[in-house]
Amino acid sequence: MNHLPIRSSYEAPLPISLTGSAVALVPLAASHGDDLYALSTAKGAEDRFRYLFEQVPTPESFEQFMIKACASKDPMYVAVIRKEDGRCLGRQSLMRITPDHGVIEIGNILWGPDMAATRMATEAFFLHACYVFDTLGYRRFEWKCNVLNGPSRRAALRFGFRFEGVFRQHMIVKGKSRDTAWYGMLDHEWPQIKQHFERWLSPENFDGKGSQKTQLRAGLLSL
């Protein structure tokens, strides 16, 4: 295993904006509330919130969530903004931030109906991954989810994380016992993973209807 040199220190993430070709990640703010509440309560909300820590929000609970989330430094929330029209299509966060060890996790992901399973979702993840490895220089990027959450587990593998095991009876969430599946990505793995993302996200990989020509997962399987 080719470990990279360990730094003497790692910086904590800052509330900055990250811009891609289709989406931008910006610090979560009250101005994103209307769009986020609409997508949080749109058709299929029960499915989107099934494995999140929160329930489908009411106006009151959403207001309290936004107050806490906008002020939080860990998790550090961002809104996912579609550059085409400036709409907020989802949110995600960097969390379990551990500068002493150069370890960080992506989580609290809520991608709305217009964004989930699209090129925009892939780019939103990629922007955070680039920030974690290329800007902060962290050693380890984590993804974890309920072991029953099939879509999240498939997404982790598609994005290049490696499955590392299950913590049994790890949490109690919404009154139920949760076994947690853990996934990790390491700094020395990132350069090759990044190349596959860049090729997949390039305009040449999409036809006139916006459909992908090659799958991201197919490329990552060869690593």
Where are the regions that the model predicts?
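Active-site-proximal glycine-rich helix-loop-beta segment
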Residues: R158-G160
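Conserved GNAT acetyl-CoA-binding A-motif
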Residues: D134-K144
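GNAT-family acyltransferases
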Residues: M1-T118, Y131, T135, K176-A181, ...
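Conserved beta-strand-loop-alpha-helix junction that forms the acyl-donor binding cleft
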Residues: W143-S152
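Conserved catalytic-core motifs of GNAT/GCN5-like acyltransferases
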Residues: R162-K176
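Conserved active-site tyrosine of GNAT-family acetyltransferases
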Residues: A155-A156, Y183
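Glycine-rich acyl-CoA binding loop
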Residues: A121
